[in-house]
Each structure stands twice: as C-alpha cells, then as structure tokens.
Amino acid sequence: MKPYKIENIRNFSIIAHIDHGKSTIADRLLESTSTIEQREMREQLLDSMDLERERGITIKAHPVTMTYEYEGETYELNLIDTPGHVDFSYEVSRSLAACEGALLIVDAAQGVQAQSLANVYLALERDLEIIPVLNKIDLPAAQPEAIKKQIEEFIGLDTSNTIACSAKTGQGIPEILESIIRLVPPPKPPQETELKALIFDSHYDPYVGIMVYVRVISGEIKKGDRITFMATKGSSFEVLGIGAFLPEATLMEGSLRAGQVGYFIANLKKVKDVKIGDTVTTVKHPAKEPLEGFKEIKPVVFAGIYPIDSSDFDTLKDALGRLQLNDSALTIEQESSHSLGFGFRCGFLGLLHLEIIFERISREFDLDIIATAPSVIYKVVLKNGKTLFIDNPTAYPDPALIEHMEEPWVHVNIITPQEYLSNIMSLCMDKRGICLKTDMLDQHRLVLSYELPLNEIVSDFNDKLKSVTKGYGSFDYRLGDYKKGAIIKLEILINDEAVDAFSCLVHRDKAESKGRSICEKLVDVIPPQLFKIPIQAAINKKIIARETIRALAKNVTAKCYGGDITRKRKLWDKQKKGKKRMKEFGKVSIPNTAFVAVLKME
C-alpha cells in the first residue's frame, strides 16, 4: 500500500440496472489502473460465481482497491461493487454508506430502468456525489442527448459532468477515473480517535474463517486489537490479521485507518455472528455511539425445500449449511411433510434470492430437489386478541378462531414503453393492484406507481410483466405495510385425503380459479389406478372444484369364451366389489413429477 493520505482516498460505488455494463466497466477500471495484469484478466472479474457470470448479475458485493497517478499525486480508489437487484437493497444501502460517491451507469440505448432508479434514490438519501455515465455509446441505437434529458428531468441530477463511454472499446475510461478524483469528495477527517468501522459485507473462507469487510470511519484497526460489535453487543474478538482487496483479498502489515476500505480476520466461525451495517470498535477505547442505519435483515419470502430422493436429506442439510456460511440472510428450519417427507423451511430476501439458492443447490451439490410454492408472512389476528405470524399453510389456525387476516403490501415502480400501458394496467388489476400515479419518463416511456400485495409479486409477476411488455418493462419494489385481506387456506384432496404439499394460502377471490387449475393439472400428471380417483379443491371443508381420474379398464371376462351370461355377470359383480374395497383402502401413489408440475405452475 502507498503512504496514507486521507485527502487522496476516494470511495465510490457503481449503480446500474441488470445488463447495463457495470461489471464490464469495473473490468476496464481494473485494467486502466494496472490493478490486474492483462494475462490474468477475464470478463466480469469481480463476479466470482459462475451463476453471476451466466445471468450477468452481481449477487455478492465485491470491493477492490486501485491506485492511480493523477497530476503528480497517487490516489487510492476503493470501488465497492454492489448487487443491483431489489432483493438486496439493504446490502446496497450499507455499501453506499461506505462511499462518498457513485457512478450511475445507464445504457445509452435503453435509458433509465427501474432498479437503477431505486438505487439512485438510496444514494441521494446518503448525499453521495453521483457521476452519470452513458455506457454502450458505440451502439447505433445510442441516444446520449435523450438519455441525459431523462436523467435530468426524472432523477433531477445535473448532467453537465456526464461521461460518454464504451466499456467494450475502452472509450471514456480515463475520463471516468479523472472524474472520480475531481468530483468525489475524500472521506471527512475524523472528529474522534476511537475506532469506528462500518461492516458492509462478510465472507466465509475455509482456511481463515470469517473475513469481515469494513470501511473505517475513525480511528484505526490493526492486528492484535481486541474488538467488539456495537449493535449486536456480542462478545469480543482478537484481530488476527488485516488486509486489502488488490483485487484478491491480501493480508498486509500495519493498520487500516480512517477512510480506508479493507477486511480483518478474527476467530469468528459463523457469518451469523457478523451483521451487515454493524459498527466495529475496540474494547479498550470503545466509541460512544454506533453508526446509524443498522437493522436486522429479515426474510420476506418462504418456501419448503425437499430432496426428491429421501436418502439425500443429510446431503441437502450439509448443502444449506454451507450456503448459509456466506449468506446470513438465508434462514433454515427443519420441517416434515406427510407427502414429501423430511425437508427444510427456508426464508429468502426475495424471489431472485430464492432462485439463486435453488440453482446453487442443484449445481454445486448435484442434488435433485422439490421446492414448495413461495409464500409470504401473513398476520393472523385471533378473536381472543392474540396475533400470529404465519408463512406456512400447515400453521393456519382453525377458521372459527380467526378475527381477521392481514397480508404485506409493497410499493412498486414499473417503467414501460407507452404502448404497453393497457396491458400492464390489466396485469396489475388482475394482481389486485392499486394505481397511485403515472409519470412520463420521456416521450416514449412511463413510470407507473402501484401498491400490490407481496404474495402476487412473488409468484409470477416478473414473468408476466416481461410477457405483456415483450421484455421492455422493468420494475422494483419496496416493502410497505400490512393490510386486511380475505386470505383463506386452499386444500387439495386426492381420493378424499388432503395432501399438505399442495395446500396454499390464497385470496378468496382467486381460490376457485386456483383450485380448479391445480385439479386440472393433477389429472394430467397422476397415472390412472384400477379405481376412480377424485381430485378436489376445498376451502374450510367445502368442495369448490373437482376433477376425476378415470379407472383403468381391466377385462375380467377375457377368459370366458362364449357360454352363459350369468358367469360373466358374476365376474363383473366381483370386480365391482373389489374396486369399491380398493377405493376405501387403496393408497394413491403420487409421482414426484406431479409435485414438480403443480409447484412450477404456482
């Protein structure tokens, strides 16, 4: 590391919508500052997971320290890369709290999108210096002036410092580095000497344990210090080493001082011990107040995960345990289902988080799993005044005891071309949405603000939005309040027995159509037996939809060649009695494909 000068440090982040070129610009910055040699360079260097590269998204925040010579001075540039998706908005807010500036990257052909809007507002709340960057300027469809106008009018940013660049060709990259030095303010000199460091992420390393990523606000942290976490008021730990991201995590001598970004290792073994947004201080000279903005991360969406082969239960348990080491937001609870066997109830930050965990289990651990339909946390107010929070249909109390139920709602911003307005309004109406306002983003695009139940968002809202806008629509959401709703438990009965894996909590208005569609799907995927199988959807024991799987026909008179009809009749009567007995005592075996088909449909 170069000699320490707080006025020569610049901490910045990159804000961008999915696929607007954030990771590619980060690659070019690393190249231009010679942080990484050309022969070691690969695309999306900071996106370490295969899944991040394939989907073109950032899931984990990746910091990196670069040095750059400008006008005879050496500057330390700390890039704190952030996830772009709305599911990870708390991590984004903590990463932004570690910065003084941000690059707002906008695709010069596509313009401002919903997720970049959400993160820009987080940056503006923190009073960061925002530098607009128009990427993909080399595309024939690029409209730099129109996009500048969008940024000015809709976000309210001054675009006089806008940089036109192409991460593909490298055009505009030196200008970005110079703008960071000129426009992003250095960290404020600390007013106190006690250590105060913001935790913005953590990572589990199998060799050294937990690496805690910090931005030092005041004081310094060095090897041998005894530190504690202020918000969680846990036990104290000895710092075993400190390091910087160059771009790989590299241990170093000396200390991390005010304004700098790096990591430390202590004898921490679980990511749960380290909370994002917490404040680190020393035991000997503790800071008086923790940094503002800390809150516990709580899961929003829940789903059950079961192994298709029950002998894989221990492997699944191990897989979830390993994923949890690097993901403190993932919650795991063991549960059992009458039809699916033993599995886990898991909590996620949102639908993307859930998809990523499922995909990583399948890929990294080579497991075949079934996931139940995603659910949210409902509030149940009982007649005796008690309040319950449930995320699982099996926890639904006796309807006679319920005073009313409430469901979580969200504020949604949708950006769409004008021609799809009526399609989106129909979609939101179908999802029980309430339109708050409509604004013009430019002469071709609109921003629609809606309130929607979270349960309607977590099912298939994104797919349907992409479908009705031919892929041009984008949205982001933030959690709102709970509102009263007619939420009921829908049960599916197969041969008069309820199958818990198909039960779900739905709004009364949607119960009949949902029940009917599940019954129709099951008729197609459950193989016929030797007796009729009724498939029914029920609410509070009342049947609202029914389908029947017809019995397999077995010709019991095949061995009778001619002869008396009474012989045949006797055989038919015997078969009828046998079928009746089978219907009473026979078990219907439901193939795994049936569970997968229904849960995919949901």
From Swiss-Prot:
EC number, UniProt record? 3.6.5.n1
Q: Where in the cell is it found?
A: Cell inner membrane
Give a single Pfam family match. GTP_EFTU_D2
Topological category with respect to the lipid bilayer:
Peripheral membrane protein
GO cellular component terms, semicolon-separated? plasma membrane
- Record's function text: Required for accurate and efficient protein synthesis under certain stress conditions. May act as a fidelity factor of the translation reaction, by catalyzing a one-codon backward translocation of tRNAs on improperly translocated ribosomes. Back-translocation proceeds from a post-translocation (POST) complex to a pre-translocation (PRE) complex, thus giving elongation factor G a second chance to translocate the tRNAs correctly. Binds to ribosomes in a GTP-dependent manner.
Under PANTHER family, the record lists: TRANSLATION FACTOR GUF1 HOMOLOG, CHLOROPLASTIC, TRANSLATION FACTOR GUF1-RELATED
In the record, the note on similarity to other proteins reads: Belongs to the TRAFAC class translation factor GTPase superfamily. Classic translation factor GTPase family. LepA subfamily.
Q: What is this protein called?
A: Elongation factor 4
